């Protein structure tokens, strides 16, 4: 299984790398983490998939961990000059 699944012309390589690193450091089984990059109008959507039972750990209490991850990934995406949305999927 690949760590990140993107097309060859990634629009947000820095954001994908940062997001993958952060999520892998949170979950118990980092091999199950994938990040898919999807063009979604003017923004790029990053779909983060984690293993079974890991989504709660990534989202955190009241969504604080997910909000923090989104903030850091958006800052990394600004280096790439793109706007991103992040979806956490089970």
Where are these regions (language model features)?
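Glycine-centered tight-turn and secondary-structure capping sites
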Residues: 60-63
């Amino acid at each position: 299984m690949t760590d990140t699944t993107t097309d060859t012309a990634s629009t947000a390589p820095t954001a994908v790398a940062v997001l993958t690193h952060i999520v892998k450091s949170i979950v118990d089984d980092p091999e199950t983490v994938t990040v898919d990059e999807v063009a979604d109008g003017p923004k790029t959507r990053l779909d983060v998939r984690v293993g079974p039972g890991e989504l709660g750990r990534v989202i955190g209490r009241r969504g604080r961990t997910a909000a923090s991850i989104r903030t850091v990934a958006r800052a990394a995406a600004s280096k790439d000059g793109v706007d991103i949305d992040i979806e956490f999927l089970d």
